[in-house]
């Protein structure tokens, strides 16, 4: 699975504070300790794994998106589409990344 260098650069060092579903099976929101949020459009209801940790890297292949966390964990999400499914906003709601 290839590294998503751009998204890795945006998220590296942020700690996962919580994960919740977007209503009506429209996606997942990963909240970080700095108040920023990663929103991922998913195909229907996605399982919500209970993982925490600091983002080390992000990998992506097709519709599979993996956040590699420290010390040793991976948050794997299935996106709705290979592109146009991921967005990151900072604590003020300013767009930092969109794909």
Describe every region a protein language model picked out.
Residues 1-99:
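Surface-exposed, interaction-prone regions used to assemble/regulate multi-protein complexes
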């Amino acid at each position: 699975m290839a590294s998503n260098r751009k998204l890795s650069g945006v998220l590296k060092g942020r700690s996962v504070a919580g994960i919740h579903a977007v209503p009506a099976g429209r996606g997942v929101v990963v909240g970080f300790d700095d108040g920023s949020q990663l929103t991922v459009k998913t195909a229907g209801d996605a399982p919500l794994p209970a993982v925490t940790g600091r983002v080390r890297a992000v990998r992506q292949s097709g519709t599979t998106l993996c956040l590699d966390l420290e010390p040793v964990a991976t948050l794997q999400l299935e996106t709705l589409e290979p592109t146009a499914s991921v967005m990151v906003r900072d604590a003020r709601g300013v767009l930092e990344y969109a794909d």
